[in-house]
């Protein structure tokens, strides 16, 4: 990855580059940590900001399993702990989550996430403000001939939620972010002051950026 960036530096004018941005899944953990360390060592003094975005998606084991993720809740907790010593003043950590709309109805008739502890952990994680920013998306499912029967169940809301459930969960998670001090600077993006993604704002405004 470092060699790719160094090659880009040869062919593009990156003297005034404002942000290097990388996107990773949270596994394999040690490999991700090592990549972050190498990138920081090579580029931290050269560029003012290095942004790492991690596709967490959910803290709910059932949702993670249904969506084919390789990490479950305890593994994600360990991953987040391992990121703590890698946080620096020039490093921005973003975390991606998806509103799956997987809910149930309690005995009192309240609608809530199927795993209430997952919601509590999400709220505690957000309130800690360890994350500089969050990306929050809604689940989108499309027909696929290879897994047609499974996809029909997915789209029907049998596995995850209906569209209404998904939007309801998005609103719930969005409010948690806003209440914790994160500002909404794009439809799906929230950040602490001065931590919004430069590349998110730049490519939407058709300004110069290099995508690899």
Predicted regions span which residues?
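Conserved non-cysteine loop/helix-boundary elements of the Radical SAM core domain that shape
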Residues: 1-175
């Amino acid at each position: 990855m470092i060699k790719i960036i160094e090659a880009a530096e040869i062919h593009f004018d990156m003297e005034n580059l404002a942000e290097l941005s990388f996107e990773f899944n949270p596994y394999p953990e040690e490999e991700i940590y090592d990549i972050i360390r190498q990138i920081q060592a090579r580029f931290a003094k050269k560029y003012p900001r290095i942004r790492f975005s991690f596709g967490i998606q959910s803290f709910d084991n059932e949702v993670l399993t249904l969506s084919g993720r390789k990490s479950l809740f305890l593994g994600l907790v360990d991953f987040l702990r391992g990121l703590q010593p890698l946080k620096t003043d020039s490093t921005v950590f973003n975390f991606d989550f998806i509103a799956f709309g997987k809910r149930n109805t309690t005995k009192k008739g309240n609608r809530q996430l199927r795993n209430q502890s997952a919601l509590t952990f999400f709220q505690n994680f957000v309130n800690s403000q360890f994350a500089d920013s969050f990306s929050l998306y809604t689940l989108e499912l499309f027909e696929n001939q290879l897994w047609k029967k499974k996809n029909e169940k997915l789209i029907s809301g049998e596995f995850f939620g209906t569209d209404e459930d998904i939007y309801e969960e998005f609103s719930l998670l969005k409010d948690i972010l806003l209440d914790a001090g994160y500002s909404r600077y794009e439809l799906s993006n929230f950040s602490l002051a001065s931590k919004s993604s430069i590349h998110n704002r730049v490519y939407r405004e058709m300004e110069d950026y290099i995508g690899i």
